[in-house]
């Protein structure tokens, strides 16, 4: 199992921490990614161009370089590619695979579980083999197949099931033959246009959810700052703030920092066009 416990008794946080043993999973030195596919990332600390906080709990992370990931897989259709390496990516929970096409082009893709260096993969708009890493339209993938990196719109690039260990299962086509029905890992059942592409297999790094962070410093290294309770703030900072001592919320329901109803209250706009594509939500309720 690639989860490794940190053997140290210097403090209680480290004593209970676990990490992923990347030496068993990766095939290349993490300090040597493909330079032609790297972009420098500027840190914003959750601030906008006015210096105001727009995303809370961000700031102070380690420096990163962004790996340009090919989510579309349409640039080199029907050209066989070879997996050259499986690498760590600090910008996502899964691993990425560096592939080289027969014409010499290189690109990064989300690494499926079970793929190895030297494996051949292919992307096509026509029916091809059902193997991990092969990309094709949903119309050509049989029922029961696990897929990831699923497009919401044809040729728009994969947007669904891209994080570690995630996938969706194909349930079949609808009665019109225009859509393919997928069950997402959240439990939601949804329709996708059959022209949308998906990649066969489950996303790599299945044990990501088993990692125990253990101490605050590891999250600070990742750029995650502390989360403060609203009831501990002043009334001008949060709807729950103020009062003498530990005061109750004082409202009919808990609120977000922006005054919106929170915890168990449905906030989805049912007039969105995509509502018609959802068959059952993640709670199993019929739409």
From Swiss-Prot:
Keyword Ribosomal protein assigned: yes
Keyword rRNA-binding found: yes
GO BP annotations listed: cytoplasmic translation
The organism's place on the tree of life at top rank: Bacteria
Gene Ontology MF, one: rRNA binding
Pfam families referenced in this protein's UniProt entry, alphabetically: Ribosomal_L2 (PF00181), Ribosomal_L2_C (PF03947)
Gene3D superfamilies: 2.30.30.30, Nucleic acid-binding proteins, Ribosomal protein L2, domain 3
Keywords: Ribonucleoprotein, Ribosomal protein, RNA-binding, rRNA-binding
Disordered: annotated segments: 222-266
GO cellular component: large ribosomal subunit
Oligomer and partners: Part of the 50S ribosomal subunit. Forms a bridge to the 30S subunit in the 70S ribosome.
Functional note: One of the primary rRNA binding proteins. Required for association of the 30S and 50S subunits to form the 70S ribosome, for tRNA binding and peptide bond formation. It has been suggested to have peptidyltransferase activity; this is somewhat controversial. Makes several contacts with the 16S rRNA in the 70S ribosome.
Stored HAMAP family: Ribosomal_uL2_B
Family of this protein: Belongs to the universal ribosomal protein uL2 family.
This protein's name: Large ribosomal subunit protein uL2
Species this protein is from: Mycoplasma pneumoniae (strain ATCC 29342 / M129 / Subtype 1)
Name of the coding gene: rplB
